[in-house]
């Protein structure tokens, strides 16, 4: 990959991270259950991506059974990831949800060698542990059994499913268009979550519906498609460590839009995460094409 292509991929990836960082704000902005928010975003993401693929005259389904099964599995993982992510935000706080989610660079460093012909280098382990340290500083004191503890467990499980979904998509689906890959994952998640309509009323007020449409189309369909496109061109561990900037983006957005002022923990942890991301960015740009 040329230096120009690397720069373009890096900028696309960072823009996707900035948009995805805004997802957590909807946990506070939308007055609906975690299940309904997740179901709504998958429905509107699926519709948006379907219309985009039809407009571009692109296929919406894969032609091989293996690819469709991989897409089904990735969609299930994506649904679980989104549910546990928003559950973490409700049980603990949006900050804790974002920060525990970003233990996934550490998880990715150890998962990737299992499925790809690569071994983690000492630098990979160092950067992953640096991210973990930054996240650890950001999380306040734990007390097992309370909502904070349950929120952190939910966030960690969200991190695992997110990391494994990326691995499945990278290994089995990276030769397909990112919009098609994201459409099938969103559709699978929407079908899986459809039963929520039986016990949770569908929102009828314009505010909730409008925010769900915005979350599903722009902050999910567009943002995650751009993320998938960039991720397919990067090593998983590189994507994981570079994406560790997302907690910093989320904290800044919450500060600007919701008035949540970061404390000293957020500042110190954010600096460590930024440092790890900067080192990985420099290393990525120096790699031989």
List each model region and its residues.
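Transmembrane alpha-helices of multi-pass small-molecule transport proteins
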Residues: 9, 32-80, 105-111, 161-165, ...
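Hydrophobic/aromatic residues within transmembrane alpha-helices
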Residues: 30, 37, 41, 88, ...
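Helix-helix packing/entry segments at the starts of transmembrane helices
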Residues: 97-103, 169-189, 220-256
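Hydrophobic transmembrane alpha-helices of multi-pass small-molecule transport proteins
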Residues: 49, 53, 72, 78, ...
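Specific transmembrane alpha-helical segments of multi-pass solute transporters/efflux pumps
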Residues: 50, 56-95, 101, 137, ...
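Glycine-/small-residue-enriched transmembrane alpha-helix faces in small-molecule transporters
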Residues: 1-40, 47, 73-76, 84, ...
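Specific alpha-helical transmembrane segments that line the substrate/conduction pathway
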Residues: 36, 43-44, 86-119, 158, ...
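Juxtamembrane helix-entry segments on the extracytoplasmic side of multipass membrane proteins
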Residues: 6-9, 31-39, 62-68, 140-161, ...
């Amino acid at each position: 990959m040329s230096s120009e292509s690397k720069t373009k991929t890096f900028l696309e990836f960072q823009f996707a991270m900035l948009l995805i960082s805004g997802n957590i704000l909807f946990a506070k902005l939308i007055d609906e259950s975690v299940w309904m928010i997740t179901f709504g975003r998958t429905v509107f993401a699926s519709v948006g991506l379907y219309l985009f693929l039809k407009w571009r005259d692109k296929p919406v389904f894969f032609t091989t059974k293996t690819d469709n099964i991989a897409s089904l599995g990735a969609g299930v993982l994506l649904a679980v990831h989104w549910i546990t992510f928003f559950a973490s935000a409700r049980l603990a706080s949006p900050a804790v949800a974002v920060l525990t989610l970003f233990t996934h660079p550490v998880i990715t460093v150890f998962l990737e060698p299992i499925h790809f012909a690569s071994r983690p280098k000492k630098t990979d382990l160092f950067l992953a542990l640096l991210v973990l340290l930054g996240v650890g500083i950001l999380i306040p004191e734990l007390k097992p059994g309370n909502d904070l503890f349950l929120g952190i467990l939910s966030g960690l499980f969200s991190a695992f499913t997110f990391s494994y979904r990326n691995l499945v998509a990278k290994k089995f689906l990276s030769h397909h268009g990112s919009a098609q890959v994201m459409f099938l994952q969103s559709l699978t998640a929407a079908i899986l979550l459809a039963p929520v309509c039986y016990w949770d009323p569908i929102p009828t007020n314009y505010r909730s519906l409008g925010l769900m449409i915005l979350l599903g189309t722009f902050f999910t369909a567009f943002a995650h498609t751009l993320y998938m496109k960039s991720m397919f061109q990067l090593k998983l561990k590189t994507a994981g460590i570079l994406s560790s900037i997302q907690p910093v983006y989320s904290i800044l957005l919450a500060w600007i839009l919701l008035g949540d002022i970061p404390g000293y923990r957020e500042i110190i942890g954010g600096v460590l995460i930024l440092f790890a991301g900067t080192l990985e960015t420099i290393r990525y740009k120096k790699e031989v094409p």
